[in-house]
Amino acid sequence: MILFIPYLICLVGTSSALKVMTFNIWLSGAEVTNGMEKIAKQIQNVNPDVVALQEVESPDVVTNLTLLLGDNWSGVHHCNSTYPDTGILTKHTIIPGTYVHVDYGMHVKIQLLDTKRQISFWSMHLDYRSYGPYACYNKLVNSEKQIMAGEMPTTCTGRVQNMVQLVTNQNFINQISKSNVVPVIVAGDFNVPSDEDWTEANRAEHGGWAFEWPATKILRDSSGMKDSFRELHPDPLADPGITWSTVNKFEKEWDYTIPEPEDRIDFIFYRGPLRPTSSFPYAGTGPLTPIPHQWGNEWPSDHYAFITEFQDLPVSDDPVDPVKSVDRKYINRHGRDALRVATPQCNAEIIDGSEERQGRSLSLSGEGQHGSEVK
Ligand SMILES: *[C@@H]1O[C@H](CO)[C@@H](O)[C@H](O)[C@H]1NC(C)=O
Ligand SMILES: *[C@@H]1O[C@H](CO)[C@@H](O)[C@H](O)[C@H]1NC(C)=O
Ligand SMILES: *[C@@H]1O[C@H](CO)[C@@H](O)[C@H](O)[C@H]1NC(C)=O
């Protein structure tokens, strides 16, 4: 019996903290002066372990950020080189051959230095069009069907289809089934509020609507993921956690007289044996001067970033509930099309600042192509 005690202490000793940041970098810093430097500086101030990026405008954005962040940082972006949009930065080790993408996001597995732990990490940026809160504040909108038409359009892919594509992705399903050993984190800009936020209690603050926004609901119901912020702060009235917007306070048309609705649209979801200990929106420490006078702001984005700190607990042997099928009401004709992952296969590179200085970058093997993740 006594012999077991040092072993237990040893197990406890392997647990460590994990700080995750999701950061929409607003056209890659183009809307403030020296935007790229400011993005890097804000990441350094937060000092996260992993960052989910959105609005990576071109492939050299991740290269430049890793160069600015310093030696131990590396990154990957979505392999769509026309507009990568999503990317991941970390000061730990990106595991080659683990890149996977969907149309609106991408994933790599990360080995946490100084531990035996790995995480499966997704950065997502769902479609920005037909922004739901605008419908809710439009007095000509009087049925939920009209709002849902924006989330789940029949003529193109919307946020419902984007999320259904993620939760039905075979790699994602495999990751969830192993999340008791390798936690899964889905972070990003969903461009839509949470189904846990627009409740009866705060109807008055939401244009008179309580509404079950579907993207977060699909993620929670189907994959059993939890929203780290809402878990720690369950009352949306007391803790709205607004992330939109830092500087977009009034619409440019009508001479900035019409206010922009404020919402929490950036999220850090997780599944696995780790426990969030703090979670908060973040926009630096300086003043946030609204559009159109934002150019001198130290904070380079029109979103707040979101940060969640996890306590990384020992591996669990508990069985994992598998991913459940998506509620049929979220599948329309265009949704079925989205289930067949449309994006062609492509290669992604791990971009390492120190290697890049010498004019080359580490290439992922063919295993990194879509649909062939090592299980
Ligand atoms: C990245 O850095 C290179 C070299 O300084 C520069 O030419 C390029 O414009 C930068 N790209 C972005 C997106 O800032
Ligand atoms: C970078 O990583 C090396 C090797 O893991 C470590 O010795 C060093 O302290 C790290 N540097 C920084 C700035 O974190
Ligand atoms: C890459 O992204 C652009 C812009 O979103 C899109 O139009 C294009 O279809 C994408 N390319 C591929 C190969 O998916």
Residue ranges and their predicted role:
Residues A52-E55, F229:
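A short beta-strand-loop structural module common to alpha/beta enzyme folds
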Residues K329-K375:
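Long, low-complexity intrinsically disordered regions of secretory-pathway proteins
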Residues V56-V61, P84, F190-P193:
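Acidic helix-start/capping segments at beta-turn-to-alpha-helix junctions
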Residues L18-E31, V61-V76:
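Internal alpha/beta domain cores that form substrate/cofactor-binding pockets in large enzymes
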